[in-house]
Amino acid sequence: MKPSIILYKTLPDDLLHRLEAHFTVTQVPNLHPETVARHAQAFASAQGLLGASETVNRALLEKMPALRAASTISVGYDNVEVDALTARKIVLMHTPAVLTETVADTVMALMLATARRVVDVAERVKAGEWTESIGPAWFGVDVHHKTLGIVGMGRIGMALAQRAHFGFTMPVLYHARRRHQEAEDRFNARYCDLDTLLQEADFVCVILPLTTETRHLFGTTQFARMKSSAIFINAGRGPVVDENALIAALQNGEIYAAGLDVFEHEPLSVDSPLLNMSNVVAVPHIGSATHETRYNMMACAVDNLIDALQGKIEKNCVNPQAAG
């Protein structure tokens, strides 16, 4: 008899068939309490859980006594109570490697769009404001040869450093929990403390997960330390930044512009002052959102769950100690 799993994400047919070859699959639209209650027997017997974005907490786990593995279609897992899973000996799998290059492309796009004011001037053209040769009011700033500061030198930080160093001849500074020798050797990246990075970088790019240590890491003090010409990019997690402090820094001219893929509360409220600022490029958490990469993430998550329920957790496991 096949193990049973709960699937709370729509998958392409080929990936669904791959799951069905190994498991009895119950598909649900979400993990809301009413959904769990409606499918109580399926949740109670499920050994696996696969999906994205929904909250996985102790209350849900109480309804899933047979659960052995959860697989998220994401690299981040701040919506999952990992400690609760680990206490129950439930492994959590994620998809870190397959989205690296795509997210780095997104960060680079935000850097270029903010520096060259691509969104702002495109909207002005559409509004019929281009009636003569453009002047300084339409100008942006250069990207090449400017200093890039990366906060969080993981896989995505490395991919961004590669683009900046080789493609745009940018000196690279970085701040991370530990030195990254490969970044220093390949890209001549310079490790520094956060204050030094903020004071010297022309672009400050944040690529951090959300933890208790990183929540509101960027606030009034940090923005005040940045150059008034600096461009701030956040492609990690929204709550790493105190959004009110960022808004104030932009309104007061403490920094030049911001490119934001993530926000403290998502979706971003239509009333947010950020949406009324011409020097802000705001996109809806599109970091990995290409057809190719999202498919690869789903395929990776499917394979992760198959492996985990066969006792194979050598890669992509957040909490391998749970299997001990």
From Swiss-Prot:
User: Catalysed reaction(s)?
Assistant: glycolate + NADP(+) = glyoxylate + NADPH + H(+); (R)-glycerate + NAD(+) = 3-hydroxypyruvate + NADH + H(+); (R)-glycerate + NADP(+) = 3-hydroxypyruvate + NADPH + H(+)
One cellular component term (GO) for this entry is: plasma membrane
InterPro entries cross-referenced by the UniProt entry: D-isomer_2-hydroxyacid_DH, D-isomer_2_OHA_DH_cat_dom, D-isomer_DH_CS, D-isomer_DH_NAD-bd, Glyo/OHPyrv_Rdtase_B, NAD(P)-bd_dom_sf
Protein name per its UniProtKB record: Glyoxylate/hydroxypyruvate reductase B
Q: Which residues form the active site?
A: 237, 266, 285 (proton donor)
Biological function: Catalyzes the NADPH-dependent reduction of glyoxylate and hydroxypyruvate into glycolate and glycerate, respectively.
Q: Which PANTHER family match?
A: 2-HYDROXYACID DEHYDROGENASE-RELATED (PTHR10996), GLYOXYLATE_HYDROXYPYRUVATE REDUCTASE B (PTHR10996:SF283)
Its domain of life reads Bacteria
Does the keyword Oxidoreductase belong to this entry? yes
Stated family: Belongs to the D-isomer specific 2-hydroxyacid dehydrogenase family. GhrB subfamily.
In its UniProt record, a GO molecular function of this protein is: glyoxylate reductase (NADPH) activity
* Enzyme Commission number, as recorded: 1.1.1.79, 1.1.1.81
An example Pfam family from this entry, by short name, is 2-Hacid_dh_C
PROSITE patterns listed in its UniProt record: D_2_HYDROXYACID_DH_2, D_2_HYDROXYACID_DH_3
Annotated NCBIfam families:
PRK15409.1
Subcellular location(s) per record: Cytoplasm
Q: What class of enzyme is it?
A: oxidoreductase
